[in-house]
From Swiss-Prot:
Belongs to the phytochrome family. Regulatory photoreceptor which exists in two forms that are reversibly interconvertible by light: the Pr form that absorbs maximally in the red region of the spectrum and the Pfr form that absorbs maximally in the far-red region. Photoconversion of Pr to Pfr induces an array of morphogenic responses, whereas reconversion of Pfr to Pr cancels the induction of those responses. Pfr controls the expression of a number of nuclear genes including those encoding the small subunit of ribulose-bisphosphate carboxylase, chlorophyll A/B binding protein, protochlorophyllide reductase, rRNA, etc. CDD domains: HATPase_Phy-like, HisKA, PAS. Residues 11-20 have a biased composition (Low complexity). NCBIfam families: sensory_box. Residues 231-414 form the GAF domain. Homodimer. Contains one covalently linked phytochromobilin chromophore. Residues 913-1132 form the Histidine kinase domain. This is Phytochrome. GO terms for biological process: detection of visible light; red, far-red light phototransduction; regulation of DNA-templated transcription. It comes from the Eukaryota.
Amino acid sequence: MSTTRPRAATHSASSGSVSRSSKHSARVITQTPVDAKLQAEFEGSVHSFDYTKSIDISGDSSSVPSETVKAYLQRLQKEMLIQPFGCVLAVEEGSCAVVGYSENAPEMLDVVGGAHAVPSIGGQQQEGGGGGGGLLRIGMDARTLFKPASAAALQKAATFADMHLVNPIFVRCNRSGKPFYAILNRIDAGLVIDFEPVMPSDVPVSAAGALQSYKLAAKAISRLQSLPGGDIRLLCDTVVQEVRELTGYDRVMAYRFHEDEHGEVVAEMRRPDLEPYLGLHYPATDIPQASRFLFMKNRVRMICDCCAPPVNVIQDKRLRQPLSLCGSTLRAPHGCHAQYMANMGSIASLVMSVTTNENGDDSEGGGQQQPQNRRKLWGLVVCHHTSPRVIPFPLRYACEFLMQVFGIQLNKEVELAAQLREKHILRVQPVLCDMLLRDAPVGIVSQTPNIMDLVKCDGAALLYGKRLWLLGTTPTEAQILDIADWLLEHHRDSTGLSTDSLAEAGYPGAASLGDAVCGIAAARITSKDFLFWFRSHTAKEIIWGGAKHDPNDKDDGRRMHPRSSFKAFLEVVKRRSLPWEDVEMDAIHSLQLILRDSFHDIDDSDSKTMIHARLNDLRLQGIDELSAVTNEMVRLIETATVPILAIDSNGLVNGWNTKAAELTGLLADEVIGRPLIDLVQHDSVEIVKKMLYLALQGEEEQNVEIKLKTFGIQEEKGPVVLIVNACSSRDLEENVVGVCFVAQDVTWQRIAMDKFTHLQGDYRAIVQNPNPLIPPIFGADEYGYCSEWNPAMEKLTGWKREEVIGKMLVGEVFGIHRMSCQLKGQDGLTKLRIVLNNAMAGKETEKFPFSFFDRHGKNTEALLSANKRTDAEGIITGVFCFLHVTSTELQQALQVQRMAEQAAMDRLKELAYIRQEIRNPLYGIIFTRKLMESTDLSEEQKQIVQTSALCQRQLVKVLDDADLESIEDGYLELDTIEFTLGTVLDAVVSQGMILSREKGLQLIRDSPEEIKTMCLYGDQLRLQQILSNFLINALRFSTSEGWVGNKVVPTKRHLGSGVNVMHMEFRITHSGQGIPEELIKEMFVHNQDMFQEGLGLYMCQQLVKIMNGDVQYLREAGRSSFIINVEFPLAQTDKQ
């Protein structure tokens, strides 16, 4: 199927993250020249610039000269202007020689007016430099401008690979002692250092600026994490509220980028007297692609005064390229943006980027990838103020951390939305099948539900056999036929088309359709027949969030202003509909395939042969896999060096391996049959009870700590502490019959942890003890530097103690780069920061899932416990972290468990495949029968077709029985419809005719004449299923040349008030020795080893039981009988 998107040619549709990434890249490439054109027009004609007319998203970008685009990109990335509230130095790495500085740097850093020149690195005074250089000159040693301690701090920070981790550095000028925050970022020419003055009201931070900054956002982070899932609007409302409380701006907005790059204000907190912008949409040009690139590079962007004249940056003339200020916190706003802010009455702003994973998945692949390259810009949190405003860097850093947490929560919402989409697809499938069980294909437009229920649309149509069926808002019949002809002519090789703009897709008659139809999804079902879905223009979907623009206002539409942007967006989107989402196209494609199959002849014999072959392969493969899994499981349990214990459904121990016996001092013979509760410590009783209860319900808890009592020689060592994973044990019918606890002994780890956190004994002797029982331990001081790394951590990670001590724990030791214990992306880094900061604040974390890649790229899964570390006076001096890593044996046991689960899942998938393969020819049979019903038939022919229809409906009913548990437990919901008993018996007998003829059996019907027309209320198809199963079994176990009789004995009972109930005795008698006794037992008692015939008998017996009836099997001399007793209400009063 083809698809079109704004300003892109028609192309084949694809799905997945690769397709989305390609589409995004295409939009960026196409949008950038439009941005460049707009900027060029603004700079070329400031006073006559008409913003509304300049924005035309649908304009042709190919007309923009490449030189204009190149100049535009260079201008944005290489502009040498900064804001005046701070100053900039650019230095060479290593030597710290100045290669550039802002013109206000000499004055701000107090190096103007001194009597002595500042010596350079080589000991000589530098001349020149020009432009207000004073005593600050190109080539001088920048370290001499600051106090020795500050110079040393800058020198140390310059050695960090990721300077973001150590920003800001608190420094003081050498001459006046004036305090600054120094913010470093690395460029090709060296280092760019921003210096922001520390205000008297600020609380100066230490060298651990990043770590300290997180504390400022602790409350906001806790609130975000406590929000219920499934509500992105609430999440956005909360984050803007928290940012406004943190920063104090007049207006804070959450701004989301849509798939076509345009933006929308989805949440807002503002001063009451300000005009609301909530709900406004803005064209993509409002935030150019180059600016979005800068937002990805510099996640927080502050403009303190858009009206303040910018300051020029001077650089060494010997540099080949202009200094890049892309990462500078002081970079000046571009003229177009400054004008935009001024027009909307905003003087200061703070913009924070919100990024999410490209594919919406929290796991981002292996250790050899660069996770940061797989982020995308979801949107922005934008703050505006009506007067100049400066936010200190530590607080901005806290806001950036809050945005990272916000991004994690958004990822969770995206994953939840993906799950809901999958559920939607699963709900759509029965709808599709139901459509085809009716008048295919006309029923999908003439009945309810119809194709408009499949996807969101304004109208739909079916073109079939040169006839049209219309639903909702559609083009006229003549226009639809013209669209079909255009598709056949220009898209003859495609199975369909989807576009949000017929005009841009090239349809010549798009203008005549008006605004009612802009987008279309067309699916070809035959060579000349189509299904159509139509959507109107987007503008009607957009709601004004605030007061509508008053036409009497003298707002100049030529000025750049949010309302002007919104007006421009309305002009653009009235020619375009909402885009068709992937999940919608999947649903349309599924219906297309099923309909196309309905028009093809189906070879029943080939299908039957394929299905039987597949079933045989499935049976053999299943036996081999389950046998291998069982043998491996038994071997592992017997030889495992981790404790494994099993409990039955009554809570009694029925499994106890050697390791469990070793730890507790109790042999298996001593515990088998005893309640598990008797073997656990008092404080673990409720925990174990809850685990058992949930596991027996099928809910398996993981990583739960319990304590077992010890006996005999082990008793003096105290209780055994275990981390337990509960695994529900199931029979072949997926019934939970017990629980298996796979555990890890953490007794020594718990003892060590208690000693560390309470400062008992010589902790260093314990930490550095090479004893394998000591867990992996690492720690950080109050500044965030790694202060502990024990031998177990060395062995686990491959990194030596001397390689990590003194480095930043988050970012350098655990980071997203290869030269560290690499985490799975930025989200993993953010989560670790939250855990450590919570511990530093006194909030301990237990058993937090934690994974990283060791030095050799091997993934390590562990549970992390973080605890504060205090000195003798109780003052927090750092954090201790303990890792619980599952042993090899436990990992193998869990792997075997996963193998068993995978084998079961494979069986389910294979069964689903078989069901689908049966359904496809079944749909063809149903379609053929419906065609026969529409012809002139005799009464006998009509009865044959009716019997065939009942058999087909019974087959569909059985195929839909995905939940056999409901039948076994007696909770199945029965249908109650009026039916004629004679038609049921005809359908039952027809199912036995082939087998009876093959075996030469005589099939005898012995029922009163009134049975044929007797009308009853009940579940017709279930009764038909029961009787046909018993009849087939009777035929299968009858002797050749014998007979099978089918007798019905009705007995009417009066219940009063004109209500009559008919008691029916169905007796199916057959010659021979009868059905084997083992199968008859299986009909009444469920067991794990039953045959498929036994399972069928058992299910039918359960169905009879659900219908408040009973089944017997009576053996007599030379014959045996199924006797089924069940009652049905009469559908009409007996007149006789």
